[in-house]
Amino acid sequence: MRTLALLAAILLVTLQAQAELHSGMADDGVDQQQPRAQDLDVAVYIKQDETSPLEVLGAKAGVFCTCRGFLCGSGERASGSCTINGVRHTLCCRR
C-alpha cells in the first residue's frame, strides 16, 4: 500500500511539473523553441527508514534517480528506463 502511495505521489509531481512546463511555454508565445528531451529531467529521491517493497525490488534508501535523455552522468549508473511525454529515456541513479 505504501508503494502504491509513493508511486502515485511521484506520478502527481511529474504531471504537475509537465503541466507547469506546458503553461509556461504557452505564455512565452510561438517564437520560442521547445526544450530538448535532455532538458526535461525528472528526479526521484527514495528515503525509507524500514525495509519497503521498493527495496525488495532493488531501490535502496538514499538513492537519487534522474530520467536522462541519453547517457547517465558521472557517478551514475543506468537502472532502468522512464518515459517523459511518451518518449523512453534512461533512468540513472547514484547513491
Swiss-Prot record:
One of its GO terms (cellular component) is extracellular space. It is found in: Secreted. It comes from the Eukaryota. Transmembrane segments: none annotated. The keyword Cytoplasm does not apply. Keywords: Antibiotic, Antimicrobial, Defensin, Disulfide bond, Secreted, Signal. Residues 1-19 form the signal peptide. Belongs to the alpha-defensin family. Microbicidal activity. This is Neutrophil antibiotic peptide NP-5. It comes from Oryctolagus cuniculus.
